[in-house]
Amino acid sequence: MSLFGFFKNKGSATTATDRLKLILAKERTLNLPYMEEMRKEIIAVIQKYTKSSDIHFKTLDSNQSVETIEVEIILPK
C-alpha cells in the first residue's frame, strides 16, 4: 500500500460497516452496575440514527478477566 493510497476515501459501504462495528469489553472482576444501563443507552443511540429495532448483543470468546460483547445491527432497507 502506498502512502497516497492511505488517504484515499473508502467506499460508503465499507465506512458504514466500520462505523457499525462496536466492541465492548468489561472486566469480569469488576461488578459494574452501569453496564446494563450503558447497553440500553447504546441501543437508544443506535435506534435514533438508524431507525433499526433489530439490535443483538453477543458475548464473544472470553477469558477469565475480560468479557467481550459484540453489537450486531440489522439495518432496514
Curated annotation (Swiss-Prot):
Q: Which Gene3D superfamilies match?
A: Cell division topological specificity factor MinE (3.30.1070.10)
By what name is this protein known? Cell division topological specificity factor
Family note:
Belongs to the MinE family.
Highest lineage ranks of the organism? Bacteria, Pseudomonadati, Campylobacterota, Epsilonproteobacteria, Campylobacterales
Which UniProt key words apply to this protein? Cell cycle, Cell division
Top-level taxonomic group: Bacteria
The free-text function statement in the UniProt record for this protein reads: Prevents the cell division inhibition by proteins MinC and MinD at internal division sites while permitting inhibition at polar sites. This ensures cell division at the proper site by restricting the formation of a division septum at the midpoint of the long axis of the cell.
- Biological process, per Gene Ontology: cell division; regulation of division septum assembly
Which HAMAP family does the UniProt entry name for this protein?
A: MinE (MF_00262)
